Regions:
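Histidine-dependent nucleotide/RNA phosphoesterase domain, centered on the 2H-phosphoesterase fold
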Residues: 1-181
């Protein structure tokens, strides 16, 4: 199973993010834009994991998240990564020490259980669109200025499974840990 630990967004936040994606997609010649149901914030990517290790992952999540207070994040700031000449657009998360500490604790916990995890510096972001090619008159700075920050209280984290169903990428929650608050 292909697994990751994530923060899932409320329906309200997903609708707000979808409006940004919709506007961005209108400015694109091509691109693969994130479905509303797949919007999330990845905390730890595990990749392919045997189903008999799911309980270990849930144990790590409980040990490192259950006693933490809920907290608020601010979503804002358009950015992009360039990969082979194609763009991946994302919406960032403003610097948040509580979020970063949670992510670092999860990575340490997963490593203690001998999971292979990506430990590149944490750059929290929400993927809006992959393999994008934009209209020549698309002004990223102008676009970035018209989108407002989004705020959300973080009360849970989820273990997510990524799979293709009927040719579509689908994310399913396998377990949830509630934060205090």
């Amino acid at each position: 199973m292909r697994l990751f630990i994530a923060i899932n967004f409320t329906t309200k936040v997903k609708k707000q993010l979808y409006q940004i994606i919709k506007y961005l997609s209108k400015e694109a010649i091509k691109g693969n834009f994130t479905k509303t149901s797949n919007l999330h914030l990845t905390l730890a990517f595990l990749g392919e994991v045997s189903s008999n290790r799911v309980q270990d992952i849930m144990k790590v999540m409980n040990q490192n998240a259950m006693d933490r207070e809920s907290f608020e994040i601010e979503i804002g700031g358009l950015g992009k990564f360039i990969n082979n000449g194609e763009l991946l657009y994302w919406y960032g998360i403003r610097e948040n020490e509580t979020l970063t500490n949670l992510q670092h604790a999860l990575i340490r916990g997963l490593k203690a259980y001998e999971f292979s995890v990506d430990d590149k510096p944490f750059k929290p972001h929400i993927t809006l669109g992959r393999r994008c090619r934009m209209n020549s008159d698309f002004d990223e700075n102008k676009f970035a200025k018209i989108i407002s920050p989004i705020f959300m209280e973080i009360t849970t984290i989820n273990l997510m499974k990524s799979e293709y169903k009927e040719g579509k990428l689908t994310y399913t929650s396998l377990g949830e840990v509630k934060l205090q608050g």
